[in-house]
């Protein structure tokens, strides 16, 4: 415990300590009954109720244990004495005892004092152990001021910190705005082809429905009741229910009744090499104008026309 107090006083730059290290450690090693060793810490100036006060602390090592008188007092070095507040002895790790005394006076009262000395001994009149005089006034004073002093560069540091905070706030605000704008943008602007391919996409045209080539060869279901069953409607249903813009669907002319003596011959349709499907005209025709209407598929009509015999009239073109 004594060594820690000595190190603290050395760090504070105590001017009242002896210069020899052996004298510093000797009282602590002697134990009980050895000579007390006082030391003064540099005075500290405090501001109390608008007035300056000077605080001086005296540390005494290797004092008598509790129950034995060991007073501590301060003087100006001329025989005067000032009572100080003394704390009770506290045990140290090496078995010795330590006491602490403090003196607190206004700076005006201590202004008349040039030096200050701390004493300890069996009685107040016995100056058995004393510290070296501590200078309180003049240029050589080692008093320290604990007032709040303005630090240099504080205002510039505050301005830099404020500018950095403002820059970080602007970057965060820009990031939030960009994120919100991207979330509210259409799918095409975000580069999402899956969302932009829907039928409600405003920036892409609607896909055209292309009729399948084999839809003309497949039989179609009968029309519902109450709907028109004309050739134009059948063709529209066969092509998916839609017609191109500007196109008109016209019905095929009705077939005349066939005479028994004169056979009607039509030219055999040829297959288009560019089209893999053999298209043989409209899928639905009226066979008789006076008889009931019936529908034949394209493949049945082509087979019927191909099986007809050649015409007997030589005036028929192509006969």
Swiss-Prot record:
Keywords: Cell membrane, Disulfide bond, Glycoprotein, Membrane, Receptor, Signal, Transmembrane, Transmembrane helix. Residues 1-16 form the signal peptide. Disulfide bonds join 58-118. GO terms for cellular component: plasma membrane. Its main location: membrane. SUPFAM superfamilies: Immunoglobulin. Residues 17-160 are extracellular. Residues 260-271 have a biased composition (Basic residues). Glycans are attached at residue 78. Residues 182-319 are cytoplasmic. The keyword Disulfide bond applies. It is a single-pass type I membrane protein. Residues 189-293 are annotated as: Disordered. It comes from the Eukaryota. The keyword Membrane applies. It is found in: Membrane; Cell membrane. Residues 189-207 have a biased composition (Low complexity). One of its GO terms (biological process) is negative regulation of thymocyte apoptotic process. The chain crosses the membrane at residues 161-181. Component of the pre-T-cell receptor complex (composed of PTCRA, TCRB and the CD3 complex) that has a crucial role in early T-cell development, particularly alpha-beta T cell differentiation. Heterodimer with TCRB; disulfide linked. This heterodimer assembles with CD3 proteins into a signaling-competent pre-T-cell receptor complex. Interacts with RHBDD1. PANTHER family: PRE T-CELL ANTIGEN RECEPTOR ALPHA (PTHR37866:SF1). This is Pre T-cell antigen receptor alpha. It comes from Bos taurus (Bovine).
